[in-house]
Amino acid sequence: MNDSAMGSELDESPPLPDKVIAIHEALAEAKIPHAFGGALALAYYAEPRATIDIDVNVFAPVKRWREAIDALTQLGVATGDLDPTALERDGQCRLWWGNNAVDLFFAYDPIHEEMKKQARRVPFGDTTLTILAPEHLVVCKARFDRRKDWLDIEQMLIATDDLNLEAIEGWLTKMVGATDPRLTRLAELKSELAASE
């Protein structure tokens, strides 16, 4: 996603935790089911890491994108650089709220219905948020296939006792194919961790 839209001026928008709560409340008020992913969800399953991004899985088809965008625009999220054609093609977009990226991922695959069903309610400040289940967070991170994602996956494999590896492998196979190198990397990581116990 393009980072060029980020404002370089002093960010006078609310702090990140307040933005997360505001996004949650705005989408809930618009009756748009959603769950947070990324580093925010990771913090509930493994060692937290710093982030300035807000990843939101929107459990609605991409044709409802205007409803989600309208809800966020009212908060002060910048949507002027949004490319509707790319959003409809890719099922995702990056917006900016001050210096924080807000990444929206819309539903287009059967896994997204499972994500919605298995999302977990967690405490966040004085409220409660919905986050992705750990298995679905691992699948998302494996699909992105960045170095930091594999570090996060390793931490989750170590710290999350009840992680359903069979479900992770099943969904990843459906989404990327049985011969994809990401499945090999996941298997190697599991073996390395098992050998170190």
Regions found by a protein language model. Give the residues of each.
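Compositionally biased terminal segments of proteins
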Residues: 1-197
